[in-house]
């Protein structure tokens, strides 16, 4: 379909797994966030998740909730998110950009306008954590018109029937939430349980599956990369961006990416 599929094909040829990096626009301020985004892109990010701040981020843990709050206090609007995407797209023409947004802003701005502007400014697809696949038909129809990829979320509790539904809704990739609850860096992850679920996904779905929620270290990336198509890292990166530790951010991304090379 586009940049996302191309990226997974390229990684497969290189025998690597995808590093999906998430950061929030406008946290701790717009300029620092732009530097942070550039830093993660320069140091090994394969797919970028661009966080759009929202007042009620139900799926997010404490670190990312703070980022939402601060970005909103900084007055970050859709225009700022688009400006950031457009700026990054000029410098990084081949890296897929996913907009991570709750449904309310899409609805408020208008599905048509939201999709059209996103596409114009270099966005490749959306992750909408509070929009289940069975309620996404209307949005997906508009996204299709603008060649935008819908990335649905699956949970540890997803049944086989649900996994099939998630797979059908996905255009180019699926996102498996590794643990129940909210996002956030964790010391230990239940690898065996995650592996079992990812294997179930693979059996029922032919699209790449990336694993997120809790991934923060090289060993997490290596372990999960041994059975999934990639890992999503958010809270650990957002925390460093919030502390304006831009160099540390680049180093963490390099380290995580090392864990995803065979």
From Swiss-Prot:
GO terms for biological process: L-tryptophan biosynthetic process. GO terms for cellular component: cytosol. Tetramer of two alpha and two beta chains. This is Tryptophan synthase alpha chain. The active site is at residues 49, 60. CDD domains: Tryptophan_synthase_alpha. The keyword Amino-acid biosynthesis applies. It catalyses: (1S,2R)-1-C-(indol-3-yl)glycerol 3-phosphate + L-serine = D-glyceraldehyde 3-phosphate + L-tryptophan + H2O. Pathway: Amino-acid biosynthesis; L-tryptophan biosynthesis; L-tryptophan from chorismate: step 5/5.
